[in-house]
């Protein structure tokens, strides 16, 4: 199941939904919930049959509304359903954000980013100072995805974060947000002795130039 994230072959919807509902392995069900996200997005873009898209969304919603479901399955289901434009999804994201479980709160930030709903900008920015590095990283990516340019000063500060996952997320966000200061920082970061961070900065620079050219 892993590796099917970018796959949108409609013939796989039935098997994936069946795995989500019935597989005895939590790991497999979690992977199925994640893989179905591509179909939700494809449905929003009118790239698959509407009835099939609805089938996918109903399966994910069923998992989210079912008590006793493993947390990891519900987290991936929330991230996947976030691509949907259905009005009830916003409440699901909000519920996830206020969950007592850290993993679900992180997934809520991922979902905010995928929703492309700018109403989540302030919530995402507020988590840039979270004591939890996974939350800071997810928040940074969300600020980038939601094009929250007002968050740039806080993102610049996070480049000194002690956690690499946070710094990498910030580099991604700067690539999405662009601007003179961001490009200067990314250019400098591309010469980092840390190969992973240098590669992330180079990729972010390319991303920044792509978005800049697409706006011309």
Give residue spans per PLM region.
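Residue-level signature of alpha-solenoid helical repeat scaffolds
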Residues: 2, 18, 34, 75-79, ...
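Structural signature of alpha-helical solenoid repeat scaffolds
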Residues: 2-5, 37, 82, 113, ...
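Amphipathic alpha-helical scaffolding segments comprising HEAT/armadillo-like alpha-solenoid repeats
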Residues: 9-21, 42-66, 86-98, 117-129, ...
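Alpha-helix N-cap/helix-start positions at coil->helix boundaries
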Residues: 10, 25-27, 69-72, 102-103, ...
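Alpha-solenoid HEAT/ARM repeat scaffold
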Residues: 14, 30, 58, 71-75, ...
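Hydrophobic residues within the alpha-helices of tandem HEAT/HEAT-like
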Residues: 36-41, 208-210
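Solenoidal tandem-repeat scaffolds enriched in leucines and small polar residues
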Residues: 49, 63-89, 102, 106
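Terminal, low-structured helical/coil segments at or just beyond the last alpha-helical repeat
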Residues: 199-216
């Amino acid at each position: 199941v892993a590796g099917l994230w970018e796959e949108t072959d409609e013939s796989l919807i039935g098997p994936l939904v069946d795995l989500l509902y019935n597989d005895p392995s939590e790991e497999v069900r979690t992977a199925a919930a994640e893989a179905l996200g591509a179909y939700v997005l494809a449905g929003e873009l009118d790239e698959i049959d509407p009835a099939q898209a609805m089938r996918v969304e109903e399966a994910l919603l069923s998992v989210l509304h079912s008590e006793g479901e493993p947390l990891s399955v519900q987290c991936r289901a929330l991230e996947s359903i976030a691509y949907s434009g259905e009005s009830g999804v916003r409440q699901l994201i909000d519920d996830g954000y206020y969950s007592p479980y850290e993993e679900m709160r992180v997934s809520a930030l991922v979902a905010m980013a995928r929703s492309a709903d700018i109403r989540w900008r302030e919530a995402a920015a507020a988590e840039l100072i979270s004591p939890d590095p996974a939350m800071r990283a997810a928040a940074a990516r969300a600020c980038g995805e939601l094009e929250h340019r007002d968050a740039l000063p806080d993102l610049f500060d996070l480049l000194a974060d002690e956690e690499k996952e946070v710094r990498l997320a910030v580099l991604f966000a700067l690539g999405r947000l662009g601007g003179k200061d961001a490009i200067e920082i990314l250019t400098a970061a591309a010469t980092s002795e840390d190969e992973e961070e240098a590669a992330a900065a180079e990729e972010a620079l390319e991303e920044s130039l792509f978005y800049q050219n697409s706006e011309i």
